[in-house]
Swiss-Prot record:
Similarity section: Belongs to the parvoviridae capsid protein family.
Protein name: Capsid protein VP1
Region (Phospholipase A2-like): 52-97
Transport listed as a keyword: no
InterPro entries tied to this protein: Capsid/spike_ssDNA_virus, Parvovirus_coat, Phospholipase_A2-like, VP1/VP2
């Protein structure tokens, strides 16, 4: 302890050294210290899994692990050269930092994103201090296209042919025009700060690019505000899918809100009440919006599981069109001053309609143009009338971006943590988990009487169970719940010729109304060797291309088959089992009855419904106090905070108002529609299969039978079709 009035020795030494350095200080950033030099044997503060991404590490740690690591190595070498020249790169933003950011501007990996963010923060902090290195001055000139050597298309990894091939560039949402132009005012990967009420699962509410000084779109009428990209990028335990489609938005309801309700004479089970709105919404909640059939094949043939992690959305190349009629001639022209309005319902204030198997999703074929569906919703009803708790929403009450021709809109979202979807079938059955070579040490009741001469007498006897009486063995687990369905045959002659589509169906009753249990809990479609049967409303049924809406024949639909889950789940058309119904005694025999419905019991295990290329990705878990295993019955991921609804409408423009005042509501508008492109990028986390199985697996393939046609392609009229549903459970795994 130092005496009063004196400093400790260590503090005095430290202050003295600091004063000496300050006394000799020269203008500019201070010179580097010896410890700031890169040492070849130094580990430094390197990000886990990398060799060079981090400060103070050595320069000889072997080959970089990826592009971000390679950029970090070049950055470290540039710092080393500056240190050799007596400059201190750590205390100013310099050309090496700028080159590092530029090299990683298309890198969406965690390390790439983190590296760019760190040096962007460094630049912002040092700018007010004048410690940002000025870029090299060049004479202004027009942007010239960059010449590229023609190359054959190749996989996104850049390899796979003889010799090294250039890798295809990933979609850079932050670019305008060609791939070498300046970034967007609002790049997709850098959303604005989210409002406080958004929660941790949503990164942004979306943003529109600002208007330019000439009141054109932010990117100008002459330049596109984004690039077309449809691809998948496979990166070990992740895959990033990017889809771009062209959309068209008509003016719905002549800009009016309207009540909608069931028709007079409808049955009580079919009554409803709600509202239609002049807004549309974007729906990309189907797997085939994001995966091509070939990518889906790669996904399910190589992975035991997958789940979504992040989503980026962008509207770009927005064009507002005006339609005029003159002497029977229709003219369509750009309207550069009209707007569309866009917003995301990130607080889930509006009734959520995504995940209800609606039409209107992004089409599976990228060349097809689609119409944005109209937003409508239902609220509480009594018959076809509203009740006191019925809710009405005016969407103009929500803040929205107003975008003109050339503007864009971006939105980013992070999925909540959900379990991996199990994309495998079991190679064992739940009732066959034992070693057949060894008897159990537990006993079971094997007899309740024994012969005695010409009669029998009550006598309890017990046995150990082995392979010959495997049905009697003790087991740990029960199959999953059951809600029995009627069995239907694909061969019409096997079915009863009465009308039982409603009367014979399994239903539930809620608030005085009956609804089909469709598809209901996940249950197996049929037993072994009974492929022609299916549960009446216990499977997903997709329509083939060109099928009518009502009463189509079986040849025009695609019926899914959940046969692979019969290893753990009951068969939907069979009873769950039998249950004792009395107390046996001397003069009363034991009796049982079939169990056709069975709720959840302790010890039950089961598989959820499979997902399909044509099926939904997610569903919103209802906002209730209680819920049990909320896995959507139509398949996919149950989410408390799913991707918000993104809504869009054409802003009304009054048409030729009268020159005299009228208090009446304006009801005449110029005829407009809007169009543009939409891109959706989703990052998926993969669970790679690593089976030690010896014999070959069953995998999905397109050559399942001899065919003169190519599946998943267009016909002579240019119509794309999907001839069969593709699930995910081809690989196998033990229970």
């Amino acid at each position: 302890m130092a005496a009063d009035g004196y400093l400790p020795d260590w503090l005095e030494d430290t202050l003295s050294e600091g004063i000496r350095q300050w006394w000799k200080l020269k203008p500019g950033p201070p010179p580097p210290k010896p410890a700031e030099r890169h040492k070849d044997d130094s580990r430094g503060l390197v990000l886990p899994g990398y060799k060079y991404l981090g400060p103070f590490n050595g320069l000889d740690k072997g080959e970089p692990v990826n592009e971000a690591d390679a950029a970090a190595l070049e950055h470290d070498k540039a710092y080393d050269r500056q240190l050799d020249s007596g400059d201190n790169p750590y205390l100013k933003y310099n050309h090496a930092d700028a080159e590092f950011q530029e090299r990683l501007k298309e890198d969406t990996s965690f390390g790439g994103n983190l590296g760019r963010a760190v040096f962007q923060a460094k630049k912002r902090v040092l700018e007010p201090l004048g410690l940002v290195e000025e870029p090299v001055k060049t004479a202004p000139g027009k942007k010239r296209p960059v010449e590229h050597s023609p190359v054959e298309p190749d996989s996104s990894s850049g390899t796979g042919k003889a010799g090294q091939q250039p890798a295809r560039k990933r979609l850079n949402f932050g670019q305008t025009g060609d791939a070498d132009s300046v970034p967007d005012p609002q790049p997709l990967g850098q959303p604005p700060a989210a409002p406080s009420g958004l929660g941790t699962n949503t990164m942004a509410t979306g943003s529109g690019a600002p208007m330019a000084d000439n009141n054109e779109g932010a990117d100008g009428v002459g330049n596109s505000s984004g690039n077309w990209h449809c691809d998948s990028t496979w990166m070990g335990d992740r895959v990033i899918t990017t889809s771009t489609r062209t959309w068209a938005l008509p003016t719905y309801n002549n800009h009016l809100y309207k009540q909608i309700s069931s028709q007079s004479g409808a049955s009580n089970d079919n009554h409803y009440f709600g509202y239609s709105t002049p807004w549309g919404y974007f729906d990309f909640n189907r797997f085939h919006c994001h995966f091509s059939p070939r990518d889906w094949q790669r996904l399910i043939n190589n992975n035991w599981g997958f789940r979504p992690k992040r989503l980026n959305f962008k509207l770009f190349n927005i064009q507002v069109k005006e339609v005029t009629q003159n002497d029977g001639t229709t003219t369509i022209a750009n309207n550069l001053t009209s707007t569309v309005q866009v917003f995301t319902d990130s607080e889930y204030q509006l009734p959520y309609v995504l995940g209800s198997a609606h039409q209107g999703c992004l089409p599976p074929f990228p060349a097809d143009v689609f119409m944005v569906p109209q937003y409508g919703y239902l609220t509480l009803n009594n018959g076809s009338q509203a009740v006191g708790r019925s809710s009405f929403y005016c969407l103009e009450y929500f803040p929205s971006q107003m975008l003109r021709t050339g503007n864009n809109f971006t939105f980013s979202y992070t999925f909540e943590d959900v379990p991996f979807h199990s994309s495998y079938a079991h190679s064992q059955s739940l009732d066959r988990l034992m070693n057949p070579l060894i008897d159990q040490y537990l006993y079971y009741l094997s007899r309740t009487n024994t012969p005695s001469g010409t009669t029998t007498q009550s006598r309890l006897q017990f046995s150990q169970a082995g392979a010959s009486d495997i049905r009697d063995q003790s087991r740990n687990w029960l199959p999953g719940p059951c809600y029995r369905q009627q069995r239907v045959s694909k061969t019409s002659a096997d079915n009863n010729n009465s009308e039982y589509s409603w009367t014979g169906a399994t239903k539930y009753h809620l608030n005085g109304r009956d609804s089909l249990v469709n598809p209901g809990p996940a249950m197996a479609s049929h037993k072994d060797d009974e492929e022609k049967f299916f549960p009446q409303s216990g499977v997903l049924i997709f329509g083939k291309q060109g099928s009518e809406k009502t009463n189509v024949d079986i040849e025009k639909v695609m019926i899914t088959d959940e046969e692979e889950i019969r290893t753990t789940n009951p068969v939907a058309t069979e009873q769950y089992g039998s249950v004792s119904t009395n107390l046996q005694r001397g003069n009363r025999q034991a009796a049982t009855a079939d169990v056709n419905t069975q709720g959840v019991l302790p010890g039950m295990v089961w598989q959820d419904r499979d997902v399909y290329l044509q099926g939904p990705i997610w569903a919103k878990i209802p906002h209730t106090d209680g819920h049990f295993h909320p896995s959507p019955l139509m398949g996919g991921f149950g989410l408390k905070h799913p991707p918000p609804q993104i809504l869009i409408k054409n802003t009304p423009v009054p048409a030729n108002p009268s020159t005299t005042f009228s208090a009446a509501k304006f009801a005449s508008f110029i005829t407009q529609y809007s169009t543009g492109q939409v891109s959706v990028e989703i990052e998926w986390e993969l669970q790679k299969e690593n089976s030690k199985r010896w014999n070959p697996e069953i995998q999905y393939t397109s050559n399942y039978n001899k065919s003169v046609n190519v599946d998943f392609t267009v016909d002579t009229n240019g119509v794309y079709s999907e001839p069969r549903p593709i699930g995910t459970r081809y690989l196998t795994r033990n229970l």
